[in-house]
Regions:
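Amphipathic, soluble alpha-helical interaction motifs
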Residues: 15, 62, 93-96
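Base-recognition residues in the alpha-helical recognition helix of bacterial helix-turn-helix
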Residues: 29, 54-57
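Conserved segment of winged-helix/HTH DNA-binding domains
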Residues: 75-99
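N-terminal helix-turn-helix DNA-binding core of bacterial DNA-binding proteins
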Residues: 2, 7-50, 70-83
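Alpha-helical residues within the helix-turn-helix
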Residues: 43, 60-61
Length: 99
């Protein structure tokens, strides 16, 4: 039982590490409202295309987002909407701590 819990926490830690970057949080916040092109995400984040692509690749590798191509444009969408619930909880914790 302890090993199962330890394994679960290790997986959770890896996923949280994937979320632990301001640019990735911005990307996920935008994708929570629907699909978006890489170009639009680049403008939102304010980084170069290769940096945004690396952020998206990490999120894709963790099963949080997926992509699709339409011609030369790549679009991303959130496939783990529960991550938004985590943001709500984390924001609430920050509000409570600031009181």
């Amino acid at each position: 039982m302890a090993m199962d819990k330890r394994h679960s926490f290790a997986k959770l830690a890896r996923m949280l590490k994937a979320l632990a970057h301001e640019s990735r949080l911005l990307i996920l916040d935008r994708l929570s409202r629907g699909e978006c092109s890489v170009g639009d995400l680049r403008e939102l984040v304010g980084s170069d295309l290769s940096t945004v692509s690396k952020h998206l690749a990490l999120l894709r590798a963790h099963g949080i987002v997926e992509d699709r191509r339409e011609g030369t444009t790549v679009y991303y969408r959130l496939i783990t909407p529960g991550v938004c619930n985590f943001f709500t909880c984390a924001t609430q914790v920050l509000k409570e701590r600031s009181r």
